[in-house]
A protein has these predicted regions:
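Structured catalytic/nucleic-acid-binding cores of DNA maintenance enzymes
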Residues: 1-160
Length: 160
């Protein structure tokens, strides 16, 4: 259930949706090609990850978690990433999204449930998102929060 109404269903001819990037969990997702397109962006890497024309399905929470997992600062310019780091970031996104799906996604309260009214449990596994001020699970440094492109961003200032 999409309480905040970020999503919607649209039946449209292919040419109307062809600009949407492929989901990282699709079998034909090309990490190397997507990494090259990611590195062509002149924005913060967090902003690039949220760009649904690059790859679809990575939202704010999973972007923060993927960046933490890959040890990449969300403020880093996407264009300065090495190809191998961009590929590693996309692999981290795939791992984060797969782990989240296995436990029903990320629910913080009863407003965010599936069609059967069940909450997801990935929020119990978050390493970065929503943990500002708490110690980094990797190095112990207090996590920080900032705003990037209007979105809350959570990260470790030491190991990212």
């Amino acid at each position: 259930v999409d309480q905040r109404t970020f999503g919607y269903w649209l039946y449209a001819p292919w040419d109307k949706i062809a600009h949407i990037g492929i989901d990282p969990l699709e079998p034909d997702f090309d990490s190397a090609a997507t990494a090259r397109r990611l590195r062509a962006k002149r924005t913060a890497v967090k902003t690039a990850l949220l760009d649904q024309t690059l790859t679809s399905g990575i939202g704010n929470i999973y972007a923060d978690e993927s960046l933490w997992d890959a040890q990449i600062s969300p403020r880093k310019k996407a264009s300065t990433l090495r190809q191998k780091d961009a590929v590693a970031l996309l692999a981290a996104a795939q791992e984060v999204m797969t782990a989240a799906l296995k436990v029903g996604g990320t629910s913080f309260d009863s407003l965010y449930v599936n069609v059967n009214g069940e909450s997801g449990y990935f929020s119990r596994s978050l390493a970065a998102y929503g943990r500002a001020g708490q110690p980094c699970l990797r190095c112990g440094t207090p996590l920080e929060r900032c705003i990037i492109s209007g979105r809350s961003t959570h990260f470790c200032p030491h190991c990212q």
